[in-house]
């Protein structure tokens, strides 16, 4: 019987490739893995445990929170707080960042930004959802409380990023800047096993993911690009196929494996875009670039944008490098 590498083994084996290898990052990734397993368990029994539906609250963006949004956030916060690898955490679900100032956190080198449950509007109808995370080294002095400056770093400073996808199977995908690897959860054993090694975007793609219900609000360049992908051209394998679920993790994962582009541009109803730069755009951009793809706001590299606030939004175009560059041509 073929033996598969577990996520824990893979993290330890590849720790030497990380420039600051001391073990803390490996332990932090293990903590995220643990929290993801708990969230996955809650999602699988959500209908029976009466944790579907809305929580009756709004997050900082004014969006209605699902009960599982709140629960997933609590699980990640409590799991990471109970370990000593980070000095602070910022979540899409919380207005301000959290400072972990207990004794075990005083010398922690890392901070985490997280979207605990991406695509949660889909949860009640059993469509794939996910968790997105991003890890940075702190800027502030060790031994002092985390500061806002620690969180407002450009994406190029990320030391690790990834996502968990809770679908027909549960998969954890992450990068530390040395390629992208995916691990599938075996519920019978309770472990993640390497299933997608050194993931790369296919050179060509023919899928586009965009909410065409917002077409009337899009800038002219995006409208022209959408018309272009829908035109018949056998040499260029057009028209492309439209696939959009409303779950960034699900759409990104499919496009990275099969080839495609994801677009959530600015528009008249969302002049700065809708996706959050720190919690969604930066980690997905890091993964995309490590998989040979590209991520832009239409003209600028996503990971070079300097955040000004925790919940800043940005236009987001991400996928096969060739497809993204073609979309950029229409945006000029």
Swiss-Prot record:
Subcellular location: Cytoplasm
Keywords on record: Carbohydrate metabolism, Cytoplasm, Hydrolase, Magnesium, Metal-binding
Broadest EC class assigned to this enzyme: hydrolase
Coiled-coil regions, chain positions: none
EC number: 3.1.3.11
GO biological process: fructose 1,6-bisphosphate metabolic process; fructose 6-phosphate metabolic process; fructose metabolic process; gluconeogenesis; sucrose biosynthetic process
Positions that bind Mg(2+) 1: 92, 115, 117
Reported cofactor(s): Mg(2+)
Pathway where this protein functions: Carbohydrate biosynthesis; gluconeogenesis
One function term, GO molecular function aspect: magnesium ion binding
Pfam families: FBPase (PF00316), FBPase_C (PF18913)
Reaction equation(s) it catalyzes: beta-D-fructose 1,6-bisphosphate + H2O = beta-D-fructose 6-phosphate + phosphate
Gene Ontology CC terms, in alphabetical order: cytosol
Main subcellular location of this protein, as a coarse class: cytoplasm
Record-stated family: Belongs to the FBPase class 1 family.
HAMAP family: FBPase_class1
NCBIfam families: PRK09293.1-1
Name this protein carries in UniProt: Fructose-1,6-bisphosphatase class 1 1
Organism, as annotated: Christiangramia forsetii (strain DSM 17595 / CGMCC 1.15422 / KT0803)
Gene: fbp1
């Amino acid at each position: 019987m073929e033996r598969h590498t577990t996520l824990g083994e893979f993290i330890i084996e590849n720790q030497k490739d990380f420039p600051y290898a001391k073990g803390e990052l490996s332990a932090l990734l293990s903590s995220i893995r643990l929290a993801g397993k708990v969230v996955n368990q809650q999602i699988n029994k959500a209908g029976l445990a009466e944790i579907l539906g809305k929580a009756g609250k709004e997050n900082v963006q004014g969006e209605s929170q699902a009960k599982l949004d709140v629960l997933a956030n609590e699980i990640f916060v409590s799991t990471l707080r109970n370990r000593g690898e980070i000095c602070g955490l910022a979540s899409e679900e919380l207005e301000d960042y959290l400072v972990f100032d207990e004794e075990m956190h005083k010398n922690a080198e890392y901070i985490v930004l997280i979207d605990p449950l991406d695509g949660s509007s889909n949860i009640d109808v059993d469509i794939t959802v996910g968790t997105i995370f991003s890890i940075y080294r702190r800027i502030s002095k060790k031994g002092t409380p985390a500061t806002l400056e620690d969180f407002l770093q450009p994406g190029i400073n990320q030391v690790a990023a990834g996502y968990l996808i809770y679908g027909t199977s549960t998969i954890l995908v992450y990068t530390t800047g040395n390629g992208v690897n995916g691990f599938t959860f075996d519920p019978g054993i309770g472990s993640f096993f390497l299933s997608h090694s050194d993931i790369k975007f296919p050179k060509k793609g023919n899928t586009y993911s965009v909410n065409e219900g917002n077409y009337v609000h899009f800038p002219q360049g995006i409208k022209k690009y959408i018309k272009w992908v829908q035109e018949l051209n056998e040499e260029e394998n057009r028209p492309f196929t439209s696939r959009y679920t409303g779950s960034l993790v699900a759409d990104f994962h499919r496009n990275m494996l099969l080839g495609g582009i994801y677009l959530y541009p600015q528009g008249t109803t969302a002049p700065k875009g809708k996706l959050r730069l720190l919690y969604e755009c930066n980690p997905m951009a890091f993964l995309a670039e490590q998989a040979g793809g590209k991520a832009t706001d239409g003209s600028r590299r996503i990971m070079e944008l300097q955040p000004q606030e925790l919940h800043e939004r940005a236009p987001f175009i991400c996928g096969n490098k060739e497809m993204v560059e073609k979309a950029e041509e229409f945006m000029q």
